[in-house]
From Swiss-Prot:
Coiled coil: none annotated. One of its GO terms (cellular component) is ribosome. It comes from Campylobacter concisus (strain 13826). This is Large ribosomal subunit protein bL20. GO terms for molecular function: rRNA binding; structural constituent of ribosome.
């Protein structure tokens, strides 16, 4: 029986890794071993940061809402508490968008939150 070598399989595997490593710096996009090491690391970063992104955006929304609340003479925590007591169910993404793009609507929400706290 003839000996089977890995020529085609190896070439395909190397091409796949090097294709995914496009844009990496220096040897990390040219040499298979370095590319493979960096690619494994990159996939770990990607996995981690897909989860981190959700936390980062929530923090950003809270900062924006807090800034708009302060302009309306109410703290963030009292604002959220007031909205809950007034049965206004808007998530932080929508509230942050209102705070940035529609100050009048946000001021009306802040007024409702203040009234609910009284």
């Amino acid at each position: 029986m003839a000996r089977v070598k890995t020529g085609v399989v190896r070439r395909r595997r190397h091409k796949k890794v090097l294709k995914l490593a496009r844009g990496f710096f220096s040897a990390r996009h040219k040499h298979f071993r370095k590319a493979k090491e960096q690619l494994e690391r990159s996939l770990v970063y990607a996995y981690r940061d897909r989860r981190q992104k959700k936390r980062d955006f929530r923090r950003l929304w809270i900062v924006r809402i807090n800034a708009a609340c302060r302009l309306n003479d109410i703290s963030y925590s009292r604002f959220i508490n007031g909205l809950n007591k007034a049965n206004i169910e808007l998530d932080r993404k929508i509230l942050a968008d209102l705070a940035m793009n529609d100050a009048k609507a946000f001021a009306a929400l802040a007024k409702q939150a203040k009234d609910a706290l009284k």
